[in-house]
Structures are given as structure tokens and as C-alpha cells.
Swiss-Prot record:
Residue numbers binding Ca(2+) 2: D555, N557, D559, K561, E566
Residues at which Ca(2+) 1 binds: D510, N512, D514, E516, E521
Prevents secretion from ER (motif): residue ranges: 579-582
Stated name of the protein: Peptidyl-prolyl cis-trans isomerase FKBP10
Keyword Phosphoprotein: yes
Catalytic reaction list: [protein]-peptidylproline (omega=180) = [protein]-peptidylproline (omega=0)
A Gene Ontology BP annotation from the UniProt entry: protein folding
Assigned GO CC terms: endoplasmic reticulum; endoplasmic reticulum lumen; membrane; mitochondrial intermembrane space
Sample GO molecular function, one term: FK506 binding
Gene3D superfamilies: 3.10.50.40, EF-hand (1.10.238.10)
Source species: Homo sapiens (Human)
Length: 582
């Protein structure tokens, strides 16, 4: 694109071409015709030997035209040619600046039309001729091609070739635009194109950076719209033209594709595409968010997508880790929300752009799906879904052995795990670090038969690294139902009595009274204590294995039997250990 040039008011200098065709009007007999008897011509003879298919306008009286011609006599001898001077004729038609025959011969012509004109002497240079060039009473033959036509009353002509169905905004004065264009003269001669430069033409509209006609022609355009803009020379480069590519007094034709538009005063634009019901929390500065996105330019060109990487984009918002426009655009979003975020370049990558996919001064459009977000200060969110109808006197606490069913999913509904796949409830001892901290917390204080929903932030789940099947930094949603609970055992205990242990423990355990207790007697004694309700084993473990571990602990010398000296209660061992430490 060429810059706007200063207006020109210099007088038109007439070359020899115009001097030949100037106001030398013979005394004629008006609009006559060729003599039927083959005598002298009474009027101009016009042969239209090439007529273009499209003719949007025809030359009228008072129009300014630019044309090439060859002038010859009847014998074919050339007396003048604009081609020889490589200079078009540029002149007003019908105001006496041309010989009458040429004035009449140009009327009704279309751009790119070719005509042969036969001008009789009385409509040419008459009985006087033009000294040294045109003899008296000469009939003149002209071969003319019209290249341009305009009128001082013309305005910019705008034709919309393609308009997108959705138009988020239209160009106004003061906006900054990026567009592609092809520039031609009215006869189709190309003089410039942005496509050959490998980038759009970027400029402000209505600020004097463009020729006046282009300033006007871009107004009201939508991103993605295609226009044809015809600009008369007095709204383009006027009498001086531009360099060697745009001649003086040339009408210009631009085919324009608007890529994007913004204003330096623009803020981030938000459009909610889908809002899930029951949004109880919106993202704020300092939250950590996981989201999917498609990023495109204003014309729809995709430059990036998290979906192509099969991984969410994970970041803190409102803390400068992402471009300012995205930082702003993500705040206030709900989990599961889909929104469109339009970011002007001064809140994105500015005048320089980034990489080879985001050009300078580009407006960016992100279609975002918020998967989840959390704050490092978040705790487990607990919501009771249902409670048993009967009175609940005992609830779960640290150390309890619990059985529960659960479904675990991401906040977008993606199911990860369920206990129903295993055909039995999950088992855990609360506070024993056997489940993630958030689930451990959420299972406490429950009644048997109660159902809860737990929202567990990642720092109380699987953290930034995630786990098998669990993405990093994922917030987890659990639905849990408590099936049963049992009081647990103190840490380090495999068996406890409900009351005091027997006073003569070894004698009671030595069933055959031989002074030693083999594994069979030990197992029989412990099982009897459990069945009689005098004691209980660690819940959730295989009783045989637990009893075997207890026997191994008491068989100090590992000889396969327990003696009275070896048998000690854990409480006695703990007291001895404390005494030794003291």
C-alpha cells in the first residue's frame, strides 16, 4: 500500500497529444450522417470492435477520461500516437477541450473498450488544418482504448463481495486494522498487492495514514469481509500519481480482505457460550486453573490448541504467568464454563507478535473450556447427600476401620475410579495414610449409611504430578457411601482386650499345661477370646495372618513355641522401653 500524498492543485499541462485535439472546431452541420450517395461524412463514424463483458459506467459529458490512441490519415499514415510518447491522454470530455469528433467518439465508451473513429474534416481541423501536421480538409482515423473514467462528483464506490454471517464489530475511525489487498487501475493493471509481501497491511483508519478514499472505503467493514473499493483520483493520488506505478489522475480499485480490527482503547471482550447450572464458585486471582482452549486469529486461522496436545493448560491466573488479556478473561469463570475471550494486541503479544503463527498487532480469540480450578488455601469441600433415617450415635473418627463405596471423577464428569468395579467396598483405617489426605478427611464424622460428595483439591489428592489415570493438579470429585465402621486399634497393636487381660495369661494360653505354647494353642486361645467378646483383632486384616504375626512377635527366639519368659503384653514392652530410655 502506498502512503497518502499531499493534495495537488497544479494546472494540467497539455502535451502535444492534447494540442492536436484541442479546440479547433470546424464549422459543422450538427450531428449529421454519412452521405447516402457516398459523399462526404456528416458525422463521426464509430466502430466498437471490442466491448468488455462488464460495463459498470459509460463516458458522459463532463467526465474525466484517460485513454490511449493512434491517429492516422485515410492512407494509413500515422500523424500522432499516445503510445509513442508512453503517455495517456487525460482530459475532460464534452467541454470543448477536444476536437468535436473526438468528444463525440468517446461518449458512451466503457473502460477497456476499443473503438475505431472516423472524424470528418468539419469535426476535426476543418479547412485550415494544423500547420505542419494536419493538412486542410483531412479526414482523421483514430484507434482508441479507454482506460479510466471518473467525474468530480464521484464518491468512493464500495461493493461487498463477501460478508461473514457473524460480525462482532465494524471498522470505525481511530481503529487499527490488518488487511490484505490487491490494487489495480480501473483497466485491471495491477500496481500493488499485500500478498506478495508475506504479511497484511497494518494501519490506523481515519488518522491520515491512508489515502482518503481508502480511509472511507474501510469504514463499516467486518473481520473476514471482502470488499471492492473504487477510489476516484482526487481521493487517491490526484494529479501527481505515485512513482512509476500509479499514473496521474488514475482511479484505483482495491480488493480488500479485512483480517482483524481493534482500537487502542479496547478491553478484553467476554462471551459466555455455555454456563453449567449451579455455579457456586467463580475463579479469582491466585487460583490455579486447568483449562482447554482453541486459539485463533480474528479471521479464524487456528494458531494453537491444547486439544492437539491432549493435555489441559495449567496455570495460576491473575499473577502474570500468562498474557494480561487471558489473565483477565479467565477470572470470574465457573468450573465447566465455556467462554470466548477476545483479546486486543496491546493485552496479548503487541506489535511484535510471537513465533511464526501470531503476527504483530493481532487480535486473539480463545474458545476456553474451564475444567477445574482451586486455590492453594482450599480445604476439602464436604456436602451431605443423604443420611440414614435412624439416629446416628457414632460417627467415624481417626483410627476407625471403615468400609465404603465410592465413585471418583474429574469435575468435568470424566470418571476415573469406582469401587463397584471390584464387587466389594473399599476398606481403610482412617489416619493410617492408606488413602489420599482429602478422602481421609472427608470420611471422618460420617454415619453408617450416609452419602457424601467430596471435592478434594490437588494438594490434598495427587498433587502436581498426578497419578496413574489422574492428571496433574486435578481437583477430584468423590461420591462416598459409608457401609460400616469399626473401632480401630491403637497404633502398633494387632489385638486388644475389651477389659483387663487374664491374670494368669500364660497358664490360660498353655492349653495342655506342658509349659510351652505352640502356634496351634496360641491361635485357638486368641480366637476364643474374640468369639467370647473378650478381645478383638485388628480389623480389615486376615485373622490367620494377624494371629501369625502376633505369634512371631512373642516367639522371641524363633524356636516355634512361646515360653512364660517370652510372653509379654505390648503395654509391658512399651513401659520397659520407656524405662530404658529414661
Amino acid at each position: 500500500m502506498f502512503p497518502a500524498g499531499p493534495p495537488s492543485h497544479s494546472l494540467l499541462r497539455l502535451p502535444l497529444l492534447q494540442l492536436l485535439l484541442l479546440v479547433v472546431q470546424a464549422v459543422g452541420r450538427g450531428l449529421g450522417r454519412a452521405s447516402p450517395a457516398g459523399g462526404p461524412l456528416e458525422d463521426v463514424v464509430i466502430e466498437r470492435y471490442h466491448i468488455p463483458r462488464a460495463c459498470p459506467r459509460e463516458v458522459q459529458m463532463g467526465d474525466f477520461v484517460r485513454y490511449h490512441y493512434n491517429g492516422t490519415f485515410e492512407d494509413g499514415k500515422k500523424f500522432d500516437s499516445s503510445y509513442d510518447r508512453n503517455t495517456l491522454v487525460a482530459i475532460v470530455v464534452g467541454v470543448g477541450r477536444l476536437i468535436t469528433g473526438m468528444d463525440r467518439g468517446l461518449m458512451g465508451m466503457c473502460v477497456n473498450e476499443r473503438r475505431r473513429l472516423i472524424v470528418p474534416p468539419h469535426l476535426g481541423y476543418g479547412s485550415i488544418g494544423l500547420a505542419g501536421l494536419i493538412p486542410p480538409d483531412a479526414t482523421l482515423y483514430f484507434d482508441v482504448v479507454l482506460l479510466d473514467v471518473w467525474n468530480k462528483e464521484d464518491t468512493v464506490q464500495v461493493s461487498t463481495l463477501l460478508r461473514p454471517p457473524h460480525c462482532p464489530r465494524m471498522v470505525q475511525d481511530g481503529d487499527f486494522v490488518r488487511y490484505h489487498y490487491n490494487g489495480t487501475l480501473l483497466d485491471g493493471t495491477s500496481f500493488d498487492t499485500s500478498y506478495s509481501k508475506g504479511g497484511t497491511y497494518d494501519t490506523y483508519v481515519g488518522s491520515g495514514w491512508l489515502i482518503k478514499g481508502m480511509d472511507q472505503g474501510l469504514l463499516g467493514m467486518c473481520p473476514g469481509e471482502r470488499r471492492k473499493i473504487i477510489i476516484p483520483p482526487f481521493l487517491a493520488y490526484g494529479e501527481k500519481g505515485y512513482g512509476t506505478v500509479i499514473p496521474p489522475q488514475a482511479s484505483l480499485v482495491f480488493h480488500v480482505l479485512l483480517i482483524d480490527v481493534h482500537n487502542p482503547k479496547d478491553a478484553v471482550q467476554l462471551e459466555t457460550l455455555e454456563l453449567p447450572p449451579g455455579c457456586v464458585r467463580r475463579a479469582g486471582a491466585g487460583d490455579f486453573m486447568r483449562y482447554h482452549y482453541n486459539g485463533s486469529l480474528m479471521d479464524g486461522t487456528l494458531f494453537d490448541s491444547s486439544y492437539s496436545r491432549n493435555h489441559t493448560y495449567n496455570t495460576y491466573i491473575g499473577q502474570g504467568y500468562i498474557i494480561p488479556g487471558m489473565d483477565q478473561g479467565l477470572q470470574g469463570a465457573c468450573m465447566g464454563e465455556r467462554r470466548r475471550i477476545t483479546i486486543p494486541p496491546h493485552l496479548a503479544y503487541g506489535e511484535n507478535g510471537t513465533g511464526d503463527k501470531i503476527p504483530g498487532s493481532a487480535v486473539l480469540i480463545f474458545n476456553v473450556h474451564v475444567i477445574d480450578f482451586h486455590n492453594p488455601a482450599d480445604v476439602v469441600e464436604i456436602r451431605t447427600l443423604s443420611r440414614p433415617s435412624e439416629t446416628c450415635n457414632e460417627t467415624t473418627k481417626l483410627g476407625d476401620f471403615v468400609r465404603y463405596h465410592y465413585n471418583c471423577s474429574l469435575l468435568d464428569g470424566t470418571q476415573l475410579f469406582t469401587s463397584h468395579d471390584y464387587g466389594a467396598p473399599q476398606e481403610a483405617t482412617l489416619g493410617a495414610n492408606k488413602v489420599i489426605e482429602g478422602l481421609d478427611t472427608g470420611l471422618q464424622g460420617m454415619c453408617v449409611g450416609e452419602r457424601r460428595q467430596l471435592i478434594v483439591p490437588p494438594h490434598l489428592a495427587h498433587g502436581e504430578s498426578g497419578a496413574r489415570g489422574v492428571p496433574g493438579s486435578a481437583v477430584l470429585l468423590f461420591e462416598v457411601e459409608l457401609v460400616s465402621r469399626e473401632d480401630g486399634l491403637p497404633t502398633g497393636y494387632l489385638f486388644v482386650w475389651h477389659k483387663d487381660p487374664p491374670a494368669n495369661l500364660f497358664e490360660d494360653m498353655d492349653l495342655n499345661k506342658d509349659g510351652e505354647v505352640p502356634p496351634e494353642e496360641f491361635s485357638t486361645f486368641i480366637k476364643a477370646q474374640v468369639s467370647e467378646g473378650k478381645g478383638r483383632l485388628m480389623p480389615g486384616q486376615d485373622p490367620e495372618k494377624t494371629i501369625g504375626d502376633m505369634f512371631q512377635n512373642q516367639d522371641r527366639n524363633q524356636d516355634g513355641k512361646i515360653t512364660v519368659d517370652e510372653l509379654k503384653l505390648k503395654s509391658d514392652e512399651d513401659e520397659e522401653r520407656v524405662h530404658e530410655e529414661l
